[in-house]
């Protein structure tokens, strides 16, 4: 059992907050374990003036972290799992998906108005095609405009008057201690969460069995089942940041309830689907459910 490991993390305030929270939990769960931190600036962090669709997608937020694993500068990396593509390098694996934070979206408005109360023509910032589709469906009279930058930057653009509102992940606000900034938490019926939203993915080298065992200490079985189903939808529809796609799985009594949606990049041809399955005994069953639902949406 290793006693000293290095974790790789992005340098943003949110990435550091969630990485350090995971590190504290892991050190508390594994006696005599000591963790070092390697801060990495990713390609996605370097380019803030263009949309993710233009610069190559969400994989840009993990590329340099994976390089740190492959060249052995780090033993594991902490990701927001919604930034992790369906396919990762063969030499790497997702060794742990810890318990999930609240996956819902949050609306932050300057005036304190709820989504239904924003005036026609109000400017709402989001660079997520998924969120843009949800906003246009709920309020076609709003003006949806792209916004990049970290959480603080996006909030500042609201309170400086650049936007009337922005939509952010509630999990990110919570991890930064900014939950009180949320004017309204959007229900999944209004804004179906992004695939894996609110969950972390802990990645390491596939061959490092001892590291995988240590990381697995914090794996949450229910979150792993749910996120596996959601990620299977993404793989089936070949989803990326260029595709408005969402999937959200929850445990509903004794069943796994999976909801998903898919649209064209311009928001047209929006289709929704959902399925239930007796709570699966392993991730393969959850992945089959997600793959079947994704195939249904893709045929659409």
Swiss-Prot record:
Q: In which pathway does it act?
A: Porphyrin-containing compound metabolism; protoporphyrin-IX biosynthesis; coproporphyrinogen-III from 5-aminolevulinate: step 2/4
CC annotations in GO:
cytoplasm
* EC number assigned by the record: 2.5.1.61
Per the record's keyword annotation, is Transferase included, yes or no? Answer: yes
Signal peptide range: none
| Gene Ontology molecular-function annotations | hydroxymethylbilane synthase activity
Q: Name one GO biological process term.
A: protoporphyrinogen IX biosynthetic process
For this chain's record, the cofactor binding note is:
Binds 1 dipyrromethane group covalently.
This protein's cofactor list reads: dipyrromethane
Record has DNA damage as a keyword: no
Q: Which UniProt keywords apply?
A: Porphyrin biosynthesis, Transferase
Family as reported in the entry's similarity comment: Belongs to the HMBS family.
Q: What else is known?
A: The porphobilinogen subunits are added to the dipyrromethane group.
Give the protein's recorded name.
Answer: Porphobilinogen deaminase
Source organism: Sorangium cellulosum (strain So ce56) (Polyangium cellulosum (strain So ce56))
- According to the entry, what is the taxonomic lineage of the organism? Bacteria, Pseudomonadati, Myxococcota, Polyangia, Polyangiales
């Amino acid at each position: 059992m290793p006693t000293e490991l290095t974790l790789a993390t992005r340098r943003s305030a949110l990435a550091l907050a969630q990485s350090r929270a995971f590190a504290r939990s892991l050190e508390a769960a594994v006696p005599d374990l000591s963790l070092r931190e390697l801060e990495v600036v990713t390609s996605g962090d370097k380019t803030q003036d263009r949309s993710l669709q233009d610069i190559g997608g969400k994989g840009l937020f993990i590329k340099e972290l994976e390089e740190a694993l492959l060249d052995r500068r780090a033993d594991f990396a902490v990701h927001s799992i919604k930034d992790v593509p369906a396919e990762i390098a063969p030499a790497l694996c997702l060794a742990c998906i810890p318990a999930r934070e609240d996956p819902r979206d949050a609306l932050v408005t300057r005036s304190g108005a709820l989504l239904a109360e924003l005036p026609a023509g109000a400017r709402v910032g989001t660079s997520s095609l998924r969120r843009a589709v949800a906003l246009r469906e709920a309020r076609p009279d709003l003006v949806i405009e792209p916004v990049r930058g970290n959480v603080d930057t996006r909030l500042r653009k609201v309170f400086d008057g650049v936007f009337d509102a922005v939509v952010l992940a509630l999990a990110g606000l919570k991890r930064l201690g900014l939950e009180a900034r949320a004017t309204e938490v959007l229900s999944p019926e209004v804004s179906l969460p992004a695939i894996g939203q609110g969950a972390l993915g802990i990645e390491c080298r596939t061959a490092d069995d001892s590291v995988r065992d240590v990381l697995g200490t914090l794996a949450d079985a229910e979150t792993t089942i749910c996120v596996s189903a959601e990620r299977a939808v993404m793989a089936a529809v070949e989803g990326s940041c260029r595709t408005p796609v969402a999937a959200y799985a929850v445990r509903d009594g004794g069943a796994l309830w999976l909801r998903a949606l898919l649209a064209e990049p311009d928001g047209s041809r929006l289709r929704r689907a959902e399925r239930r399955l007796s709570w699966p005994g392993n991730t393969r069953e959850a992945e089959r459910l997600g793959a079947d639902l994704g195939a249904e949406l893709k045929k659409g």
